[in-house]
Amino acid sequence: MVLVCASSSKCKRNTFLQLAMVLFAVVMARIALYFHNHLDEPLVDPYDANGNPQFSEANALKHVIHLSDDIGYRILGTIEQERAREYIMNEVLALQKQLQDGPNADIHQMEVSLESGDGAHRFDFMNKYVIKKYQNLKNIVVRLSNGTEACKEEAVLINAHVDSTLPSPGATDDALAVAILLEAIRIFISRPVPLTHSIVFLFNDAEESLQDASHMFITQSPLRDTIKCVVNLEACGTTGSEILFQATSNEMIKAYSHVPHPFGTVLADDVFRTGLILSDTDFRQFVQYGNLTGLDMAVVKNSYLYHTKKDLAPYISPGTPQNFGENILAILTYLVSPEADLNNMKSSGTVYFSVFNSLFFMYSKLTSKILNTLVGGLGILLTLRGSEGSFTVALIAQVISIAGIFVIPNIWAYILGNVLDCGMSWFRNEYWPLFIYLPAIFASLFFTESLFKRSEHLALRATIFIFSLLTFIPLPSAYLFTIIDFFMVFALFLNDKILAKPGTVHPLTYFIGSIGAMTVGFESAINLLEIFVPLTGRIGTDKVADNVVATVCVCGFNIYFPLMSPWIQRFRSRCCFRLGLLFSIFVVGFSSFILAKQDTYYDSLHPRRIFVQRMENITSNEVSLHIASADSAPGFDKLSSDLSSLLTDEPVVKTEMDDWNSDWDTVYPFSQFLGSYRIPLNDTVDVTTLPSIKFSNKVVKDNVVNVTVTVEHPGLIWTVVSFDADVLSWSLPEVPSTVRRHHVREVSAYGLDSYSFNMSYLEAPIYFDFVGVDGVGHYPSKASEGRDRASIQLCEKLTNDYLPDWTDTLCIGVVSGNFKLE
């Protein structure tokens, strides 16, 4: 994107330097991408040539395939979840017998238990409160120790969840983690090395229902008080290395430092804590209720298939299970050794990051402050030394330049999404946004840099001064600015002392000054793109996706090309600036036009998520179809209208999604991100066994009512009751006193169909809204068993005949009703 002006002798003289810098940037990016995407060859044999046990991807995939392909959709409350649990228990018991019959029976002790229980907890998400109630959940718990009480009293917990969510068979989320745990058990019992600390393997029953089974374990398990730390395994992608995105103690980060394929950064930790990812894991329950520290790790690349029907074993990239499994083995091997101090698990602000998936660095919060202060302080001193009034002007110009590359691309992003209605045209590829927003950034640079006449050296000093200030940001992820700034400060020092004449910049300064940016900085920029571009397909219908991605591109550009402003000033000429600006604008327009004119912004491997439910209301006797989307790309309104015209003569109705619209309460609080339409159907309600809400033991005293509420939901799963009331107390977790709208989501094991809670509230009529998913009315998981259901028939028809192949549909039958408590 750096232009050569043919009519300018200055541009001609510097053509070689321009090309050299471009080549340097490309080569560095190519090297970084190679290591970023590199995965070792998967292993097949469970033992190496010397007979030592090793992680076998082939073994792990057998478990993944059985759970996700053979058993399929492991939805809590269905028979498939019971079958998955039975399969895992059989595998665990077989491993236990293998240990008992093998040569290591006197070295290891393996205890297996099935822990069940009921409970409730409050789940807060994006300023929403939901009460979770669960019944008869069953966790498979395996403790591996040397048989002594001392070993058992200091345990490492490693967690994976067995269930999957609608509408996903959950190969990576989270059958892969389950398979890794099974492989880890096999390997540890095959090693003739006694454990100093025990390992508790938790195959938890319910994560997708908002982390119920992990809550049950950490609040009810007999082993909970022995747990000293936790390693949580998750996935939202299908390819690449798993990332360490939460690490909360120095000792656990030290454990991670032993992995053969490190890929983690405290920057991911800081981003995750902002809530921008709109996701959470079981790790939250272990921290909140167990006061544990630990590691949270997940496969995140290619999250286009997250929670879709294509989360299947064939889409897991070869090498991903091997990479993940070997890293987990290294972590556990350290944690069960005498070297690990499990009594030193205090939370810390340790800074950590990896480079090229090969090198791992960690240092304390104090060390971080010292390094940041030294590098930043030195940078400020060097840039301010001998400063004159012109530096102030250069600094103001640099601030305006940085502001420009944030503002101008975001203005264009707003126009694309909100004016031209062609937002998210780049969705199918994590790197396609660069075709639009990279030239927009250069256009901004050429424009703003042309406004101020400043020397190249002053522009360099101003750039380094600003990056030096960034090192003082009070976040662990400020390490990134420190590394980038270190090389720039070092380059400036060499330039001023050795390489160049006073007030000039030697070309080598740019190459030296860009080393940090084009290594650690590039990895960070790529990670942001790979996380946020697929994420825009599920962040809601507000038209902000292009602005989010434009901002990510700008941040990535500043991280990778921090010295672009002085570099442009090096070739300053009116001709170069004009041509650069015009060419950049042309590329922006051309790229935007080409991408916008695609027939669709999606394909089968990068699908649009569509949420469909056929709702039968037993109170109004109305049947309706609800169709919703979770992204802001164009076309959904037309898709809904076309669908309506195929099914009925009734007009489609746009519904307002708020806390008082219970249509999508089955996915509350995620429902707040949906844009939904309601299509009335000319069908009759055909619910064989009606749900009900019954009220008993009612006592009224001094305007306060005490009552027992019993919800009966035969044949329905994932039920929700929502209502407005001034609740004074109840047998459920407390909510803030300012909250009047309450949502109680209930899940239970297969076969249970009722639950109760006691409530005390200020006397006034209460209107309960009830919704529940038909236990055999979700498609395609129950396509065969529920083929006589109208919801299954409709879902099948929609999927096969109406909806494009670039959609991925959650399609369910829902029963709703309204009940009044006088």
UniProtKB/Swiss-Prot annotation:
Zn(2+) 1 binds at residues 161, 173, 234. Keywords: Endoplasmic reticulum, Glycoprotein, Hydrolase, Membrane, Metal-binding, Metalloprotease, Protease, Transmembrane, Transmembrane helix, Zinc. Its EC number is 3.4.-.-. InterPro entries: Fxna-like_M28_dom, M28_fam, Peptidase_M28. Residues 36-365, 414-431, 485, 536-547, 597-822 are lumenal. One of its GO terms (molecular function) is metal ion binding. The active site is at residue 207. It is found in: Endoplasmic reticulum membrane. It is a multi-pass membrane protein. This is Putative endoplasmic reticulum metallopeptidase 1. It comes from Schizosaccharomyces pombe (strain 972 / ATCC 24843) (Fission yeast). The gene is erm1.
